[in-house]
UniProtKB/Swiss-Prot annotation:
Stated family: Belongs to the phosphohexose mutase family.
Necessary cofactors: Mg(2+)
The encoding gene: glmM
Protein name: Phosphoglucosamine mutase
One family name in Pfam for this protein: PGM_PMM_I
A GO biological process held by the record: peptidoglycan biosynthetic process
Function: Catalyzes the conversion of glucosamine-6-phosphate to glucosamine-1-phosphate.
PTM-bearing positions, type Phosphoserine: 108
Organism: Methylobacillus flagellatus (strain ATCC 51484 / DSM 6875 / VKM B-1610 / KT)
Amino acid sequence: MSRKYFGTDGVRGKVGTFPITPDFVMRLGYAAGRVLTRMDHHLVPGTKPLVIIGKDTRISGYMFETALVSGLCAGGVNVRITGPLPTPAIAHVTRAQRAQAGIVISASHNPFDDNGIKFFSAQGTKLPDEVELAIEAELDQPMELVPTEQIGRVKRIDDAAGRYIEFCKSTFPNALDLRGLKIVLDCANGATYHVAPPVFHELGAEVISIGTQPNGLNINLNVGSTHPESLQQAVVEHQADLGIAFDGDGDRVVMADNQGQLLDGDQLLYIIASHRHQRGRLGGGVVGTLMTNLALEHALGKEGIPFQRAKVGDRYVLELLNANEWQLGGENSGHILCLDKHSSGDGIIAALQVLHALRASGLSLADWAKRLPLYPQVLINVKVAQRIDLDSNTALQAAVTSAEGALKGTGRVLLRASGTEPKIRVMVEGQDRPLVQRLAEEIAAVVQQEAAS
């Protein structure tokens, strides 16, 4: 069944453009409340479902928080609001409070004038497809206020940030600390701005913070994991041991070594996996995505670590991890899931697992990076006016086959349609950068030619 509103990560778009409008968000809250009330069979008769609401630091978050609360209460749901907190913090609070669902108001790494609504289940995971479809169906029904005595109540959880800080610290071994480490933290002027610095400071690190002055308009603006240049520069200027950058809602992380060299999600995933494997604590294999660098797959294979690829998106990484009963997976963008530590991807917790590996091994971040030199990877986004069937187009298939022959088994070619934009993504990777660049450009030219025909 097709979806009208929900994408792979909730509802997202430009503020003021449908569906990211106050009236729709209020209706979304009402619809979610009605569905949760009908579906939760564990409620004590006469009690109401409980929903946790958090947000990042976008100025529109206040407006949408009020709209959601109004809709949920009108549907007979009690609400607890946390204020600005990372997306994974809401997953944690939802589980800890035994709530029926959690809702995050965020557009992740997007600019401030975007926003979105995403849901967590009672288990702190993405909502099942059938629940999202039920909410969409309810959205098409008229709003009918519950009887006055059944209207929900709203309260604030004043200590939500402190609870989450302690939860993050609990994922780092008690026998280790971060004393002697100078760390630059880039919080993207986003949801981690007031929780990440205390976590690393209380574990003993000397913390230098940037991107911790949100004003509602500067989230992800030239800072954070999607703009790591500020982090790299700050690490060098402060002669820090390493740097850590999060995205606006705190579920992504990238790091920089003491020379300011960037490590992406693939490299961080390797550090965690290799360290755990050496100590017999990996708990199975590792899940990446179609975009995961081939060097990671090869490096894990040499260490005897199973590796599988999921579709792009942390939702699909989680699905494959659960299917295999594995614990560790992630994306090169910095979404890293450590399911033995948390139910969802968490930038702070992922960074702590990397630091655990550094402390336990005695190696620096630069030392670890040398163990996984990434293969050159060229990605070209080709705008297309009309949809192209990538599987049946003979010209494209011939171009891909020719490129794979030129790589001689030392690389990969990937063609995929963007899920959010009218683009075809052409990715070629291998060990010979000039060859990879040429092959990617040749395939992109064929895509353009076929799109125009």
